[in-house]
């Protein structure tokens, strides 16, 4: 199952990556993000669902979680929230 990891690039790059996966025959695409990029992942999913592939794609599943990461600067453990949004072809 194809996955798109959301980072700091423009939203359009991620939207087009998801659309391309569906155009290449994928039935499901998972959008993943951590921390501050969670809201960007939701924006990508909604743009794909309502603008680019309106009526063709639906949200299949949403998973939220948190994971511990070690801050490289301080060496301390931090908890970072994560999200996975599965888009499914209708």
From Swiss-Prot:
* UniProt key word DNA-binding: yes
Q: Where in the cell is it found?
A: Cytoplasm; Chromosome
Task: Tell me where it mainly resides.
Answer: cytoplasm
Where N6-acetyllysine occurs along the chain? Answer: 8
Key word DNA-binding present in the record? Answer: yes
Domain of life according to the entry = Archaea
InterPro entries with a match to the protein in the record: Alba-like_dom_sf, DNA/RNA-bd_Alba, DNA/RNA-bd_Alba-like
**Family assignment from sequence similarity:** Belongs to the histone-like Alba family.
Q: State the protein's purpose.
A: Binds double-stranded DNA tightly but without sequence specificity. Involved in DNA compaction.
Q: What is this protein called?
A: DNA/RNA-binding protein Alba
**Naturally occurring in which organism (per UniProt):** Nanoarchaeum equitans (strain Kin4-M)
* Gene responsible for this protein: albA
């Amino acid at each position: 199952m194809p996955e798109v990891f959301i980072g700091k690039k423009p939203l359009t790059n991620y939207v087009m990556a998801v659309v391309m996966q569906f155009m290449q025959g994928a039935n499901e695409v998972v959008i993943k993000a951590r921390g501050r990029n969670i809201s960007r992942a939701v924006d990508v999913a909604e743009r794909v669902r309502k603008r680019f592939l309106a009526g063709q794609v639906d949200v299949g599943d949403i998973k939220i979680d948190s994971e511990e990461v070690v801050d490289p600067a301080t060496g301390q453990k931090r908890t970072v929230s994560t999200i996975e949004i599965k888009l499914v072809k209708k």
